[in-house]
């Protein structure tokens, strides 16, 4: 098993796979009673707390403790000011006012890739959020995460959810938000070929 997971770990690059390989190496060494190596690999997996195996690894080395996702880097004020003064940004806001913001998607992708080191991805995701296109912000953040740049604020949007509907308590907001992110990426107009609609992609006859 050790050789298998080492080979797996050495041949993947995306955080979700790196965390998986490291976690199972941690489990393998734990089974072999190599505590130091086990902790080493669990710690490596726990660097990727937005992944399932990263969270499992965190619980292995920090039983009973809660974790917090890292905050986004701070973008310098001068770069932020310059970014939001650009004509293309004004055009994106104009498209939003005309209810044609779907055409802004590729403009936002372009802006995101312009100056990554100075925070163009973060500002493009912020701009997408400003026009209520959380789905575009998530897509920008997802692409960044494949290169191990994590913009958690925009990759995991938080919107308000009711606690009660018709006197009935509904599930915790974290559970609801996770379903929305998976099913529609917070796209209010999402419609599937099968007929599912809305944020949670419900079928009309089950809604």
Question: Where on the chain are the PLM-derived regions?
Answer:
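TPR-adjacent "capping" and linker segments in tetratricopeptide-repeat scaffold/adaptor proteins
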Residues: 73-86
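Alpha-helical segment of the N-proximal tetratricopeptide repeat
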Residues: 86-103, 107
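Structural signature of alpha-solenoid helical repeat scaffolds
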Residues: 13, 49, 79-80, 112
């Amino acid at each position: 098993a050790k050789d298998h997971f080492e080979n797996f770990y050495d041949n993947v690059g995306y955080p979700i796979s790196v965390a998986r390989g490291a976690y199972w190496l941690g489990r393998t060494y734990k089974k072999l009673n190599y505590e130091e190596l086990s902790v080493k690999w669990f710690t490596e997996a726990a660097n990727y707390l937005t992944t399932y195996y990263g969270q499992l690894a965190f619980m292995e080395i920090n039983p009973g403790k809660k974790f917090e996702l890292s905050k986004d880097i701070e973008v310098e004020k001068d770069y932020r000011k310059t970014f939001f003064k650009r004509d293309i940004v004004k055009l994106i806001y104009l498209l939003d006012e005309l209810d044609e913001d779907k055409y802004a998607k590729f403009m936002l992708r372009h802006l995101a890739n312009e100056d990554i080191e100075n925070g163009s991805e973060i500002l493009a995701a912020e701009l997408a959020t400003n026009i209520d296109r959380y789905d575009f912000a998530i897509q920008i953040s997802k692409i960044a995460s494949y290169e191990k740049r994590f913009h958690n604020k925009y990759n995991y949007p938080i919107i308000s959810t009711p606690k009660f509907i018709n006197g009935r308590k509904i599930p915790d907001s974290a559970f609801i938000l996770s379903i929305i992110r998976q099913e529609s990426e917070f796209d209010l107009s999402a419609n599937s070929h099968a007929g599912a609609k809305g944020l949670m992609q419900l079928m009309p006859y089950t809604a």
